[in-house]
């Protein structure tokens, strides 16, 4: 069963990778916030615990003026808004750490993994790889829009489409049943992260607007 906590709006999850950026990560993150991002995953798994904690504090300070939510991949920082888990981690233990209001997400690459995460009570599932991408190798064949649609139709938990998502296909992901989309390289490696973020959000909002009843 889904945790049921409301996801940030707009439903664009920007995932960090400082090895892709041409500027300090905090600068790229702030550019994404200026472009309209309100949901960020800090994913810097190569850093040791002390360095990750320091970077998390810096990024959360950048997020605060924008009202953006920051979740941490694998770890949890006391002032973060949630945690994102790989497969096999305890969702109940994560809930104990983040409290009743924190977001908990899990990575999935198949229907079975997505269903297990949903049954554990997570708030969202990142599903990948939807499309080919250099930043998510090694996870088998792409699911495509048909695979995304099948899995989104099979579980109640919001699905966040990940891998190869860009401004050209974000709308198609939402129309296939994704509750939102996630991007890494499309923002982290962009020459203009603010513009790249704004373009993605524009596509998302167009779909949202088209679903609103007229009159």
Describe these PLM feature segments:
Residues 42, 131-137:
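A short acidic, helix-capping loop that chelates divalent metal ions and anchors anionic groups
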Residues 86, 123-131:
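Non-cysteine beta-strand/loop elements that form the S-adenosyl-L-methionine
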Residues 143-149:
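Short, glycine-/small-residue-rich phosphate/pyrophosphate-handling segment
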Residues 1-84, 96-123, 150, 156-159, ...:
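Conserved N-terminal beta1-alpha1 strand-loop-helix module at the mouth
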Residues 89-90:
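Acidic/glycine-enriched connector segments
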Residues 136-140, 193:
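Short, solvent-exposed loop/turn segments at secondary-structure boundaries
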């Amino acid at each position: 069963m889904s945790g049921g906590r409301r996801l940030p709006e707009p439903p664009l999850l920007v995932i960090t990778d400082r090895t892709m950026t041409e500027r300090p990560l905090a600068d790229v993150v702030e550019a994404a916030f200026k472009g309209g991002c309100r949901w960020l995953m800090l994913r810097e798994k190569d850093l040791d615990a002390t360095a990750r904690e320091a970077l998390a504090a810096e990024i959360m300070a950048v997020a605060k003026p924008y009202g953006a939510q920051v979740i941490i991949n694998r770890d949890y920082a006391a002032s973060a808004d949630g945690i994102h888990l790989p497969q096999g981690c305890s969702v109940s233990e994560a809930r104990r750490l983040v409290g009743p209001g924190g977001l908990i997400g899990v990575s999935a690459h198949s229907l079975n993994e997505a269903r297990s995460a949903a049954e554990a009570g997570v708030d969202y599932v990142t599903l990948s790889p939807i499309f080919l991408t250099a930043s998510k190798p090694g996870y088998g064949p792409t699911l495509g829009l048909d695979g995304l649609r099948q899995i989104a139709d099979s579980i109640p938990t919001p699905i966040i489409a990940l891998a190869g998502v860009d401004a050209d296909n974000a709308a198609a992901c939402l129309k296939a049943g994704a509750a939102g989309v996630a991007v890494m390289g499309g923002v982290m490696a962009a020459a203009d992260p603010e513009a790249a973020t704004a373009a993605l959000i524009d596509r998302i909002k167009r779909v949202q607007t088209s679903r609103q009843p007229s009159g």
